[in-house]
Regions:
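N-terminal positively charged helical leader segments and presequences
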Residues: 1-84
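Structured adenosyl-cofactor binding patch, chiefly the S-adenosyl-L-methionine
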Residues: 14, 19-20, 137-140, 201-240
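RNA substrate-binding interface of SAM-dependent RNA methyltransferases
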Residues: 18, 46, 84-177
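Short, acidic/turn-prone active-site loops that include or flank metal/cofactor-
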Residues: 31, 53-55, 126-128, 195-197, ...
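Short, glycine/polar-rich helix-capping loops at beta-to-alpha or helix-loop-helix junctions
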Residues: 33, 128-134, 197-203
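Short basic, glycine-rich beta-strand/loop surfaces that mediate nucleic-acid
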Residues: 59-72, 139-142, 151, 185-193
């Protein structure tokens, strides 16, 4: 039997039910009033289990919205599959996350990725947050529509992307050009680091161009999810 995870939150569960992952069962609190989700689960012939409020909160806590889905664990896409899937497209954007450890940041980034039509996210296996229950909830279901690849070595991955015809940008405060001046046409990958450490020195060296978001206030860095959102929407603007 494949590994399962619990998905919390009405929006996240609604997207799970519309997606392709196998849903083992839905568990609801007897005080829940959401016929849409219940009817959708019944339509897909997914078992529904009801618990009284005390038992439900005891098992799952009080931050679930009164509903939990037991779902097949998220399946990462292999890098070569991600590249092949987008091989015939003229314009492609991959987002590479270097050292991002906050699940709330990753969840928010996945929302921006889905909203902008970004073609995929690449995260390292080590020193990085994984796709967990918090990420799923914060993404409000966006995770169901985004390809995420987990790789062993980011620098090797960047080299492979370059060989496949991708231009790799790194987002850093020390970037040589303003992010609005970058060319987002064709196949590109954009590396975003954590707000604490930024992009590692070796990854910076492997990027083709370092770009920056100008800072006009006293604080010299943005939240990683905000930075990612700004860059992704700029890429879309340039593509018309």
């Amino acid at each position: 039997m494949s590994k399962t995870v619990n998905v919390f939150g009405k929006n996240a569960i609604r997207e799970v039910l519309k997606g392709s992952r196998r849903v083992e069962k839905i568990i609801i609190c007897d005080t829940l009033n959401d016929n849409e989700i219940i009817n959708l689960a019944k339509t897909k012939r997914i078992p529904i289990q009801t618990k009284n409020k005390k038992a439900f909160i005891l098992e799952f806590g009080d931050k679930t919205g009164g509903i939990v889905a037991v779902v097949e664990d998220y399946q990462y896409i292999e890098l070569h599959e991600l590249v092949a899937k987008n091989e015939d497209k003229e314009d492609v954007v991959f987002l590479i996350l270097d050292g991002l450890e906050d699940p709330h940041n990753l969840g928010a980034i996945l929302r921006s990725v889905d909203a902008t039509g970004c073609n995929g996210v690449i995260i390292p296996k080590n020193r990085s947050v994984k796709l967990n229950e918090t990420v799923v909830k914060v993404s409000t279901g966006a995770i169901e529509h985004v390809d995420v690849s987990m790789v062993t070595n980011l620098n090797q991955t960047i080299s492979e992307l370059k060989e496949a015809g991708y231009w790799v940008y790194g987002l850093e405060l020390t970037g040589s050009i303003d992010y609005k001046q970058a060319n987002y046409k064709g196949k590109i990958a954009i590396v975003v680091g954590s707000e604490g450490k930024g992009i590692s020195q070796l990854v910076q060296k492997n990027c083709d161009t370092l770009i920056k978001i100008p800072m006009y206030g006293k604080v010299n860095s943005l939240n990683a999810s905000v930075s990612a959102g700004i860059i992704l929407y700029e890429a879309i603007r340039h593509r018309g």
